[in-house]
């Protein structure tokens, strides 16, 4: 043992403290249903409970874990609660948590193959597994012209797709001289907000983002897309990319990929497909129809951190021609040069993303797939969809309520027929109760309540209780009247 002074945690203490953390996490999951799903703290309350200055001397680990329980836990909205039905889920699981712990313990930085070969090769291999598991086009396999990479989120995947599309449309002139303001992107108004952010970052500009009208089911209209592309060409614009969605955030709408894909193919336009939430459903053969037309896509992404029990962050981003992505993003300073890179025999994922550094995200995904197996994952996806369909049926059978959009998978959009003010009050009452957490959207200007079934440990009793609580709070509001 060295006699040098050290403030590091000893290996013995690390073992003991690590066991305490695992026990704390396990206990948290055992008691998670005892907490209000939505945190009840007020703005600034957490900071007010913390010291104004950092400690000069180190504190015992027991004090840290005590303060997590006392100071931090009250400010947590419990995303892993089985009664969390808000937004889209950001679920986790025991194998994912353990895989992430190992990733943190190894502490690798996987920017290059050479900086940790296993980090790169496991990622490539697991993403190839997913192509097979989801029935994706073979062009997304690493053995083809394309391949996959793990991004932090679908937002980053969309940005990378737009950057690659921009360079292809300009013959890589934009990287050299910047954008001229003539590139145009297309998406439905239901597309994720990250599309708008990405066109700003990529230099296309929000005025060059065309929101194409949707049909009665909130899906993009192909004929309107074709008409807008023609108008833009006549005006001297350069159609650059179409961002289609399989399972929009507001309503789970499914854009018609076969028709959109043919339009993109005929016009030489990049097609990016965002299936962040719904993509996991394709694990089940009976739901793979959502991917019809994906053979036209130049890029595609879905989020295992939403519905495949792999804790945040983990987005799987695929491209049909990896050279186009790499050529758009690659920069090789001398300090990154190495024999493996220059051999051309390896993948350097730094060229597939905006940041240079990258975590070993594939490890937790590998753990999840190996723990559950394909059939285990399918079981839980099917169960979630069945529970959502049961909830949708209850809505349809109650004359006070109506479905606000089709419910093809695990998201149900509904509202009370009394109007927006009633629905806003209902949502507020439900969330204040702490018994569950729901969020809203607006469709055709109407206030809509969303319920998404996708949390790892959600069971039928939680969905049944959600419907009971909706009924109870509805009855109270109806008695109050004035709507």
Model-flagged regions — what are they?
Residues 130-163, 210-213:
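Short loop-beta-helix segment that forms the pyridoxal 5′-phosphate
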Residues 1-145, 428, 432, 436, ...:
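N-terminal entrance/gating region of PLP-dependent enzymes' catalytic architecture
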Residues 143-145, 180, 405-410, 442-448:
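Short Gly/Ser/Thr- and Asp/Glu-enriched loop/turn motifs at secondary-structure junctions
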Residues 292-396:
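Active-site C-terminal subdomain of aminotransferase-like
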Residues 402-430:
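Conserved PLP-binding catalytic core of the aspartate aminotransferase-like
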Residues 157-324:
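Conserved PLP-enzyme active-site core in the AAT-like
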Residues 119, 148-158, 187-188, 245, ...:
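Active-site nucleophile and cofactor-binding loops and adjacent substrate-binding regions
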Residues 443-483:
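PLP-dependent enzyme catalytic core of the Aspartate aminotransferase-like
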């Amino acid at each position: 043992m060295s006699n040098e002074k050290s403030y590091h945690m000893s290996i013995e203490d690390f073992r003991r403290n690590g066991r305490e953390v695992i026990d704390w996490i396990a206990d948290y999951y055992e008691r998670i249903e005892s907490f209000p799903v939505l945190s009840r703290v007020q703005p600034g309350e957490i900071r007010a409970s913390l010291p104004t200055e950092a400690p000069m001397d180190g504190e015992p680990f027991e004090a840290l874990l005590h303060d997590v329980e006392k100071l931090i836990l009250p400010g947590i909205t419990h995303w892993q609660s089985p009664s969390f039905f808000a937004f889209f889920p950001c679920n986790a699981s025991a194998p994912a948590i353990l895989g992430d712990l190992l990733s943190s313990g190894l502490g690798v930085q996987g920017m290059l193959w050479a900086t940790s070969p296993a980090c790169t090769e496991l990622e490539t291999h697991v993403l190839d597994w997913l192509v097979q598991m989801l029935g994706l086009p073979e062009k997304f396999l690493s053995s083809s012209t394309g391949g996959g990479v793990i991004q932090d989120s679908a937002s980053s995947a969309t940005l990378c797709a737009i950057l690659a599309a921009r360079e292809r449309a300009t013959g890589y002139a934009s990287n050299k001289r910047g954008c001229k303001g003539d590139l145009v992107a297309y998406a439905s108004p239901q597309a994720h907000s990250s599309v708008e952010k990405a066109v700003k970052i990529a230099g296309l500009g929000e005025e060059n983002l065309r929101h194409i009208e949707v049909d009665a089911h909130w899906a993009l209209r192909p004929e309107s897309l074709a008409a807008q592309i023609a108008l833009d060409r006549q005006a001297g614009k350069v159609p650059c990319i179409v961002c289609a969605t399989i399972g929009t955030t507001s309503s789970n709408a499914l854009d018609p990929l076969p028709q959109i894909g043919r339009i993109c193919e005929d016009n030489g336009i990049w097609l990016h497909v965002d299936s962040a939430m719904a993509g996991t459903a394709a694990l089940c053969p009976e739901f793979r129809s959502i991917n019809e037309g994906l053979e036209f896509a130049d890029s595609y992404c879905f989020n295992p951190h939403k519905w495949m029990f792999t804790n945040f962050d983990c987005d799987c981003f695929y491209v049909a021609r990896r050279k186009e992505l790499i050529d758009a993003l690659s920069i090789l300073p001398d300090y990154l040069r190495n024999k493996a890179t220059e051999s051309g025999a390896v993948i350097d994922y730094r060229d597939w993303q905006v940041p240079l550094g990258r975590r070993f995200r594939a490890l937790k995904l590998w753990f999840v797939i190996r723990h559950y197996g394909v059939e285990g994952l399918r079981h839980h996806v099917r169960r979630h969809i069945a529970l959502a369909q049961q909830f949708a049926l209850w809505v349809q059978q109650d004359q006070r309520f109506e479905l606000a959009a089709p419910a093809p998978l695990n998201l149900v959009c509904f509202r009370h027929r009394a109007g927006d003010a009633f629905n806003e009050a209902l949502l507020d009452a439900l969330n204040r109760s702490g018994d569950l957490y729901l969020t809203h959207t607006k469709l055709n200007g109407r206030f809509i309540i969303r319920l998404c079934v996708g949390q790892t440990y959600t069971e039928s009793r939680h969905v049944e209780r959600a419907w009971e609580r909706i009924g109870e709070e509805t009855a109270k509001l109806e008695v109050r009247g004035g709507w």
